[in-house]
Amino acid sequence: MAGPDRAELAELVRRLSVVHGRVTLSSGREADYYVDLRRATLHHRASALIGRLMRELTADWDYSVVGGLTLGADPVATAIMHAPGRPIDAFVVRKSAKAHGMQRLIEGSEVTGQRVLVVEDTSTTGNSALTAVHAVQDVGGEVVGVATVVDRATGAAEAIEAEGLRYRSVLGLADLGLD
């Protein structure tokens, strides 16, 4: 996937989301930079690009619902939902079920019996995406694949593909000048 939209998104992510300095990632690993993608996924222009590019990336996958583990997946899913094209609904997987109300682990559109795309903002190990995959599968949803905006090339693709799932990303570290 190439083109002006992808180049513009890469520039916006570099400018808005790449933070240099020693950080501990959610995986527990340390890195010299952090890609705080919420700064891009919640930006008016970047969000529109993410929605279009993620739809383009997964155009050959048949799904009607998109979502993933809160919080990183939430704006990615809604960007896809609002991007031009066929109707796609969204859902959110909580980190744990609510103790009150409907006590649901998955909120939003129904995933039971649906073909589902699981998304992430940034993938490191793939654990967040796989948590969402298993939650969807546990209620009878069929996961068609996992897509992420930025892949850190640190094992997510391998972990997700080891589960028998397809995996794609819009951007890699080289696109952000971080390779």
Swiss-Prot record:
One GO BP on record is: UMP biosynthetic process
SUPFAM superfamilies per record: PRTase-like
Residues recorded as binding orotate, renumbered to this chain, are 124, 152
Q: What is this protein called?
A: Orotate phosphoribosyltransferase
Stated EC number for the protein is 2.4.2.10
Swiss-Prot/TrEMBL catalytic activity:
orotidine 5'-phosphate + diphosphate = orotate + 5-phospho-alpha-D-ribose 1-diphosphate
Q: How does it assemble?
A: Homodimer.
- Please share what else the UniProt entry notes about this protein: Was identified as a high-confidence drug target.
Give the cofactors, semicolon-separated.
Mg(2+)
Checking CDD domains in the record gives:
PRTases_typeI
The gene designation is pyrE
* Record-linked InterPro entries: OPRT (IPR023031), Or_phspho_trans_dom (IPR004467), PRibTrfase_dom (IPR000836), PRTase-like (IPR029057)
Return the similarity comment.
Answer: Belongs to the purine/pyrimidine phosphoribosyltransferase family. PyrE subfamily.
Give a short account of what the protein does: Catalyzes the transfer of a ribosyl phosphate group from 5-phosphoribose 1-diphosphate to orotate, leading to the formation of orotidine monophosphate (OMP).
Q: What is the main EC category here?
A: transferase
Q: Which residues are recorded as binding 5-phospho-alpha-D-ribose 1-diphosphate? A: 94-95, 98, 100, 120-128
Q: Which domain of life is it from?
A: Bacteria
- Which keywords accompany this UniProt record? Glycosyltransferase, Magnesium, Pyrimidine biosynthesis, Transferase
What HAMAP family would the database entry show?
Answer: PyrE
Q: Which organism is it from?
A: Mycobacterium tuberculosis (strain ATCC 25618 / H37Rv)
Molecular function terms from GO? magnesium ion binding; orotate phosphoribosyltransferase activity
Pathway noted in the entry: Pyrimidine metabolism; UMP biosynthesis via de novo pathway; UMP from orotate: step 1/2
